[in-house]
Amino acid sequence: MLHVSRLLANGGVKNLCDKFKVKIKNYTEHDLMVLNYESFERDRDHPVVVECRGLILNSRTYAVVSRSFDRFFNFQELLQNIGGEDAHHKLFQSKENFKFYEKIDGSLIKIYKYNGEWHASTRGSAFAENLCVSDVTFKRLVLQALQLDEAHNQFQALCNEYLDCASTHMFELTSKHNRIVTVYDEQPTLWYLASRNNETGDYFYCSNLPFCKYPKCYEFTSVQECVEHAAQLKNLEEGFVVYDKNNAPLCKIKSDVYLNMHKNQSRAENPTKLAQLVINGEHDDFLALFPHLKSVIKPYVDARNTFTNESTINIMVSGLTLNQQRFNELVQTLPWKCLAYRCRKAQTIDVESEFLKLTEPEKIKMIKNIIKFVSTKQALNNKLAPTIKLPSSKQLLVLIGISGSGKSTYAKSLKGYTEINRDDVRVKLFLNGDYTKLNAFYNQSRKCRQTKEEQITKMCIEQFLKAAKCGANVVVSDTNLNTQSVDMWQKMAATHNYHFLTRLMDVSLETALERNYKRSDKFPLNPETIKKQYKKFLKVNNFEYYVPVGDKFPRAVLCDLDGTVALPTNRSFYDFDNRVAQDEARLDVITCVKYLANCHDAIIVFMSGRSVICEQPTRNWIEKYFDIKSYKLFMRPSDDTCKDYLLKLKLFNNYIRGKYNVIAVFDDRPCVVRMWQDLKIPTVFNVCRDYLEF
């Protein structure tokens, strides 16, 4: 009995997954399960893990249905004593004669018999039903490789004639549809590897199968000779597989050229690397090597070309003639709207030049956002197309924003619109018209509120249907920060032939909190609730979080001045003159800043709300108390009067983002601290001496 079967019989599936991170794919209707190890599991050479390489078991009895190769390792891993003592001893200490075969660079295919019928499977599936890159199933490719027209009957007859029904027969499949690195014939081809008895696990070799090819066999005198030969491979050949005398594979020896190419090809699995490939103009060279991945690269190329295509230019030509409000409405749903605002500020239609000014992480994020936007739009069009008959002049406008962002005020300013608001419905249904009781309503348990919320949703829909019957425009003025509510209204709009629009009510958290305190006519909401809403809104609004830029860039510790390390003694916080040199130093905080910077070999970057007019005395103070010569100082421009947290965000975007790996930030002002935390700076030290906002 296999180790894994014994473990399953004693501890069940959960024990296997939790302890060894084995992935299981179940086929309930066939009583089958496919087991595969996690590539980077720390117990990679444990007997249980080693057995789980596309192993197929009966999910009721845990008996073996199809038994593939056990896990075997790369030569370099065996040099590090990974792979178990048995393989290591055989390879390096025994005098056994090995067999060396060409390593075929394709997809593992296993053919086995179950419940009286033969089946083809891949490592991750029981019936080869999974798709390759070009959306062809592997089962279809296997049948093409066998040149079978009447697929099922001919496949059964062929297998019955040539294959042992008590064993699993392993092949490598190559074709243009599943190319990895090495180039083979475009037509699907099966390469025979070995066969294995399902019960005993013994390997054997079938040397005269007429429907497949065989890897080339080499007569190297030693493993070392094979390693040296692999180092000389130049034409994308993968390398070799070393087998013992019993036809069991011991290790893979791969060429350096292949490994480098495989690393490049694997970029196609990573959206960030694909975006980087296109941004750097390397995609043509990449496709010259891997033409079968053209469909994978195309969306990224299309996204990159967004900034020069005619529709983008037309949007900007039109946008520059509009007032600010109309411009906001025009660009609010665009995935490149930040570039649109930059173009408006510069009074240019050259979106491409504004894109080129972005840092590489910003460019990558924008390319990915465009792809996401296009795919979502296409999916929505496909889903809703049958329900949309004619363009409609009726509008369903959904406002999205936190409490205190002005949604209700804006909704009431729209003439001829029916407003739908969940709070209004809550108060009407359950609170006898008393808005001051809403906080108590919100404080009820989720379970207690669930039925009531369902009634509220039902009444909101009834209000919409009533408005739709009259042909009235509708505005929904809730927060709408979850996708479920927006999706619901979008479907309602499509069903009732409404033009669906959303509008982001973008205000600062501080503004919303200030408005909340003034809402004596209704109710002041719990401020913590608004803060939680704001966190959700940042995601909805595609807020650009901080992303480390890689080891090639310097590390930085960011530090505020006034209140954080410097305390005014002879001036107010808003006096920017030579008196800043007289500020008292917070030596304990300064010590922490310097220590953290030294530990991480980081530069200290000062981000100050002070006006640049007092730059020199500020530098003198820094050099006196920090005792450093190498640092950066960014200050408020002399004509800038924006709030402190907005200034710090601008300084961060202009001078830090994409240029430094930020270790931590020190600040004392609550609203600024929240801004740093919103950016997801790894560590934010709040050193304020009082919890009050100022």
UniProtKB/Swiss-Prot annotation:
EC number: 2.7.1.78, 6.5.1.3
GO terms classed as biological process: RNA repair
Swiss-Prot/TrEMBL catalytic activity: a 5'-end dephospho-2'-deoxyribonucleoside-DNA + ATP = a 5'-end 5'-phospho-2'-deoxyribonucleoside-DNA + ADP + H(+); ATP + (ribonucleotide)n-3'-hydroxyl + 5'-phospho-(ribonucleotide)m = (ribonucleotide)n+m + AMP + diphosphate
Residues annotated to bind ATP: G401, I402, S403, G404, S405, G406, K407, S408
Keyword Nucleotide-binding: yes
InterPro entries: HAD-like_sf (IPR036412), HAD_PNKP (IPR056782), HAD_sf (IPR023214), P-loop_NTPase (IPR027417), T4-Rnl1-like_N (IPR019039)
Keyword field: ATP-binding, Kinase, Ligase, Multifunctional enzyme, Nucleotide-binding, RNA repair, Transferase
Coiled coil feature spans: none
Physiological role: Trifunctional enzyme that possesses a bifunctional polynucleotide kinase/phosphatase activity and an ATP-dependent RNA ligase activity. May therefore play a role to evade an RNA damage-based host response.
Protein name: Putative bifunctional polynucleotide kinase/RNA ligase
Organism per entry: Autographa californica nuclear polyhedrosis virus (AcMNPV)
